[in-house]
């Protein structure tokens, strides 16, 4: 999606089902409900190609035992965001904290990485906000130390109270990071809020104010975080 980012299943981008053509699944990603029938994910998750010119022929969501169709409502190439709608009605929605992130605060990534290998259950990783900007001082993204892998794309990044502070997007290639550990990024919740406002989607302003223990945080996030499958 951007020069210097993995375009395979290693970090951040959809997981590609290269060896399972009978399923006709081109890739998978993660999304989360921002209203009862609207879902946010990355724009590249709902496209068949790296250039994001060809949309998935069909998009399916899976949340627990429920599986449902998804349809693109709006997309923003520059910020790599997409809004999807479904006839399925989900009662739990994400709480989005628009107030800016702080360097050093805890961050949790929830998503469905490498679902063909690791299974379709949601996975969580923990880290810190490493920087308040992305590559080349990109102010719409921020750097995190929490691991994200192929299939995490589009998933929520949470603070220690369970509020969404960003959207998982990608990792930097190792040759750009000096050969050390992979550097990961998220789209800021402020950028997400602007995208939702443009599409007249209201935010749940009743934010969580108490620090949650991690099992509770994960349990709540799993109720609005879904696996997204892109079909050719």
Per-region residue spans from a language model:
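A conserved glycine-rich beta-strand in the N-terminal activation segment of trypsin-fold
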Residues: 18-42, 67-69, 154, 179, ...
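Catalytic nucleophile loop of clan PA
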Residues: 32, 147-168
